[in-house]
């Protein structure tokens, strides 16, 4: 019996700065997650070795030193070892507590702390210390902010460019739900080199997998940015294995091209825990290759498609391919 049933009171509000994960995180979403008895056995093609190299530890220590978060760690990315060992990282700004409860994601939910005004400078110093040539900046959703965090993104870009003018910058932004105009006005004034926003899955699965988000809104966000800053490539991605069909994936790819999205990533969804959405299928590498061929035929400037692909995986190579470098 729930606390509400026994006391007649609503559950207490989560205190600011408290991070909910797993079952606590997804307890109040509209379509309930049924915990799986055990995680599915992964096929051979998506098993990865997590190297514990000195370079990985050095980057982790540097992130802690500058009070920064990497999405590589927070989202339990399977490529963490490869990317960290290669001296790269995708930075997650605006804290590590998200205002959304997406049941596929391993980032914690709650009431976020106020923005750290020193974060843009700390991030810029870390990028300079690591001598990075290509940086991806993403964030948690911040529905508590008037601009959804767009100004904080812009401040981070500006500070990095001041210390590392040769570094290319890609932003992987939230959907700015209800804040599109103000967020894009700010973004257009300090645009990234690549503007990325993930659709994540097909429209039919949005209610179960992206509560609080809207498929058409996300498409419109990408198109609206493109109209403001035509020279900057736009990018989006899908996770496969949530219950979509191949035909639905192709249809979403067509919709992306109709909205002038330049770059596409497709990867396998991996269930972070028993309390997250269950994997419905493991897509074979040959199918990922077929999607890439179809995407190239549709006119995407770059398609990166494979079981271990994530939005920021080899992002520098994707961007160079899109720009014809």
UniProtKB/Swiss-Prot annotation:
The cofactor(s) it depends on are: [4Fe-4S] cluster
Task: Identify the pathway.
Answer: Protein modification; protein lipoylation via endogenous pathway; protein N(6)-(lipoyl)lysine from octanoyl-[acyl-carrier-protein]: step 2/2
Q: Where in the cell is it found?
A: Cytoplasm
> Can you tell me which residues bind [4Fe-4S] cluster 1?
72, 77, 83, 312
What sequence ranges are listed for the domain Radical SAM core? 84-301
NCBIfam families (alphabetical): lipA (TIGR00510), PRK05481.1 (NF004019), PRK12928.1 (NF009544)
* Protein name as it appears in the record: Lipoyl synthase
Task: Please name the gene that encodes this protein.
Answer: lipA
């Amino acid at each position: 019996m729930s606390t509400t049933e026994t006391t007649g009171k609503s559950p207490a509000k989560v205190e600011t700065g408290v991070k909910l994960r797993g079952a606590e995180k997804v307890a109040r979403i509209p379509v309930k997650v049924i915990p799986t008895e055990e995680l599915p056995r992964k096929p051979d093609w998506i098993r990865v070795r997590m190297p514990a190299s000195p370079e990985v530890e050095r980057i982790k220590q540097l992130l802690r030193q500058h009070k920064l978060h990497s999405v590589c760690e927070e989202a339990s990315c399977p490529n963490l070892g490869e990317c960290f060992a290669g001296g790269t990282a995708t930075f997650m700004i605006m804290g590590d507590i998200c205002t959304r409860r997406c049941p596929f994601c391993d980032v914690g939910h709650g009431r976020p702390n106020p923005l750290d005004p020193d974060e843009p400078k700390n991030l810029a110093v870390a990028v300079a210390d690591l001598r990075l040539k290509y940086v991806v900046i993403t964030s948690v959703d911040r529905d508590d902010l008037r601009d959804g965090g767009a100004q904080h993104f812009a401040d981070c870009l500006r500070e990095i460019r001041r210390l590392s003018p040769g570094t290319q910058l890609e932003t992987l932004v939230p959907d700015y739900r209800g804040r599109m105009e103000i967020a894009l006005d700010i973004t257009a004034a300090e645009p990234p080199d690549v503007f990325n926003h993930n659709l994540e899955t097909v429209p039919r699965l949005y209610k179960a997998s992206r509560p609080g988000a809207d498929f058409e809104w996300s498409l419109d966000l990408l198109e609206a940015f493109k109209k403001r800053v035509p020279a900057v490539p736009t990018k989006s991605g899908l996770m496969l294995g949530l219950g979509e069909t191949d035909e639905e994936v192709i249809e979403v790819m067509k919709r992306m091209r109709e909205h002038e999205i330049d770059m596409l990533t497709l990867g396998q969804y991996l269930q972070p825990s028993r309390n997250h959405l269950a994997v419905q299928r493991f897509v074979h590498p040959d199918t990922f290759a077929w999607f890439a061929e179809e995407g190239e035929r549709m006119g995407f400037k770059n398609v990166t498609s494979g079981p271990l692909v994530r939005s920021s995986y080899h992002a520098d190579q994707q961007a160079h391919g899109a720009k014809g470098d």
